[in-house]
Amino acid sequence: MRGTRSGGVDVFGNRDASGNVCGGDRGSVVREGATLAVGRDVDAPPEATARALRDTRRWPDWSPSVGGVESADRYVETGTTGRVRVAGAWVPFRVTSATRLRWDWEVAGIPATGHRVERYAGEPDRCRAVIEVPLVAAPYAPVCRRALDRFAALVEGE
């Protein structure tokens, strides 16, 4: 499904033209300015979901592209540094900004994905996990969808 939200934002996946999530596989890819927002509903409270997303020890459990992580910080904060193993090579990372429900990072000095958790009004045990991909890295969006499916299964299984 593809449509356009007001403001000229392209919508892919299963969000309707007003940007609301529809049925289906509960995943979507939405263009937001210079990024693609790859999202998936998670049947877990937003705080627990965000904590799992910020947990460096769990990244290899759900991210197909992360084979390992080394960091002094278990939960990312602004300024967290370390290295991740990607395609067999260790590369440095730095978290450029972090809040309770959002964080962004650079990998090998290059701005990479953003990560956020969105709340649903009136639904304390459900939220949406989103990975933001720069448009120049659009081919990475399917990897992010797979990552979010694995992430949701991990968080919902707790």
Q: What is each model feature region?
A:
Residues 102-158:
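Beta-strand/loop substructures that line and gate deep hydrophobic ligand-binding cavities in soluble
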Residues 49-53, 59, 82, 95, ...:
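Hydrophobic pocket/interface hotspot
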Residues 2-73:
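Hydrophobic ligand-binding cavity/cleft-lining segments
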Residues 33-39, 81, 90, 102, ...:
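Intrinsic-disorder/low-complexity, polar/charged segments enriched in Ser/Thr/Lys/Arg/Asp/Glu/Gln
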